[in-house]
Amino acid sequence: MSLVEKNTASEDAFALSEATARDYLVLLKPRVMSLVVFTGLVGLVLAPGHMNPVLAVISILCIAVGAGASGALNMWYDADIDAVMKRTRKRPIPAGIIAPNQVLAFGLTLSAFSVMTLGLMVNWLAAALLAFTIFFYAVIYTMWLKRSTPQNIVIGGAAGAFPPMIGWAAATGEITWDSLVLFMIIFLWTPPHFWALSLFTTNDYEAARIPMMPNVKGELSTRRQALFYAVLMAPVGVLPWVMGFAGMFYGVVSTLLGLAFVYYAWRLWAADSQLQMLAAARKLFRFSLLYLAGIFAVLLFEALTFKLLAAFGVF
């Protein structure tokens, strides 16, 4: 059975209701999109030189649309497991609001539009990175890794790490070591973030037969690996300051937040009861969001401040 047949064969089973603009917005996974747009914006602003403001806005919009397209394609393919999991069963396809083939067409149209617009209006390197990101998330992660290996988040996390590289490439037309460091921060952040989530949503993933780390390797192994990636991530998070494309303020904030991240991961690893483990997993999950938002916010603040002062001739 082809991929299209997989999700259209049972389409008659959906008692479709009239879809609204809000329902199509849900397909774009707006929460995920907001993080993608934010990190892409940081990459664009942090990049050296000055970019035409109109092209900058176009770049960010294309990154947002591309991210939304990935989300729609993910929901199209994952409609069967979304119907099983508590936190996803109200999404438009399992809820019977939008037909699978309409979601597929929506996702493919947005994908083509975002990539072609970015290429024609900005540059083709950024467009190629955006196209690869959409492909990696929708095909490599969603259709293959997610259902086949407990390392799905580790490898698949690359999809969420590309946006700052896309923003950087849009501004400079280049891939540099600096942009690769931004990629690595998010790449190493992803496993402990999602494994913390999976530790207190294990039943959901098990019901959907998704091989998340706790379901396959057990909770102790998951906690150990979350700590391992946190320890790897913390020093990488300081590299923007070490390499000279972030300031001292960022260096201090990233160091403190990195140490706190390791502490929360250690608390999770050291938990000696199920109740303590679940509490520690929730704390790590919440703090991981604060960590990523915090360090990228500081990067953005420093970059905007420096460019504003430079515009007034201070530097």
UniProtKB/Swiss-Prot annotation:
Biological or metabolic pathway of the protein: Porphyrin-containing compound metabolism; heme O biosynthesis; heme O from protoheme: step 1/1
Free-text function comment from the UniProt entry: Converts heme B (protoheme IX) to heme O by substitution of the vinyl group on carbon 2 of heme B porphyrin ring with a hydroxyethyl farnesyl side group.
NCBIfam families linked to this entry: cyoE_ctaB (TIGR01473), PRK04375.1-2 (NF003349)
EC number: 2.5.1.141
More about this protein: Carbon 2 of the heme B porphyrin ring is defined according to the Fischer nomenclature.
Keyword field: Cell inner membrane, Cell membrane, Heme biosynthesis, Membrane, Transferase, Transmembrane, Transmembrane helix
Entry-linked PROSITE patterns: UBIA (PS00943)
InterPro entries: Protohaem_IX_farnesylTrfase, UbiA_prenyltransferase, UbiA_prenylTrfase_CS, UbiA_sf
Organism: Brucella suis (strain ATCC 23445 / NCTC 10510)
UniProt name for this protein: Protoheme IX farnesyltransferase
Leader sequence residues: none
GO term, biological process aspect, one: heme O biosynthetic process
Catalytic activity: heme b + (2E,6E)-farnesyl diphosphate + H2O = Fe(II)-heme o + diphosphate
GO molecular function: protoheme IX farnesyltransferase activity
Membrane spanning stretches: 32-52, 53-73, 93-113, 120-140, 153-173, 180-200, 226-246, 249-269, 295-315
Subcellular location: Cell inner membrane
Taxonomic superkingdom: Bacteria
Family assignment from sequence similarity: Belongs to the UbiA prenyltransferase family. Protoheme IX farnesyltransferase subfamily.
